[in-house]
């Protein structure tokens, strides 16, 4: 499993394109969530223009392939920190936190 911390680089986003690019970004992570690539997706509440994704991808290469499809990946508009981890314990009540 991998956790991905994404931070957008405001200075790299072309002027007047922010809203359009964000809509494409939403479509990208929604598509990957709906097909099961992402297990969790959400924005940080304590950091602007940043969020987290958890994926059950088997390899770092598979994660990189997914990330390369993100509109922000091109031209270095975002920074992606990819960390491998093992989910040793998962609370049965985890789903109750959706949207909080």
Locations of regions flagged by a protein language model:
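Conserved, structured core segments of small domains
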Residues: 1-100
């Amino acid at each position: 499993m991998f956790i991905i911390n994404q931070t957008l680089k405001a200075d790299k986003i072309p002027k007047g394109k922010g809203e359009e690019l964000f809509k494409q970004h939403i479509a990208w992570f929604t598509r990957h969530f709906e097909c099961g690539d992402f297990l969790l997706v959400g924005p940080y509440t304590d950091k602007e223009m940043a969020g987290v994704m958890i994926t059950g991808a088997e390899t770092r290469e598979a994660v990189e392939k997914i990330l390369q499809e993100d509109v922000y990946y091109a031209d270095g508009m975002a920074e992606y920190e990819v960390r491998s981890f093992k989910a040793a314990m998962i609370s049965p009540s985890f789903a109750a936190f959706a949207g909080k």
